[in-house]
């Protein structure tokens, strides 16, 4: 995921995002900071919230950095916080949140810029079954509404069947199987 997200450099090969060339045989051909900010949403296994910003500002910061007006960025943040059932914690600081609440805020942050690609590493790990399925539904809604590709790495057996395409990596070999695709197309 870190290579796909242009967090670490590819050493060989070619990578494109849509029609844009990102890497070509290890050479960076696009400004990676802008690519990560504007085109890729990250949901890490650990929330990595900024400790001195409240919940709303943690989510609204990325669109603000991308040039979205503050009012619109905060509106988007509050919509996602509501969808993820943490709107009541909008003014709380990260240290005041439970682990599950922190993860839902991190998920909102990954979705708020409406990127064409979302990379999610164990996004449901700290969540109970009900909230995990709610997160998967929200990811599916995002994919449909904004034509977003979502790549999820997970060990959560309960959510795996909800995806349309499923790839397992065993002993360094990738195997594909069909999912039921109820939540994500």
Labelled PLM ranges:
Residues 161, 165, 173-185:
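Conserved beta-strand-loop-alpha-helix hinge in the C-terminal portion
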Residues 1-169:
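ABC family nucleotide-binding domain
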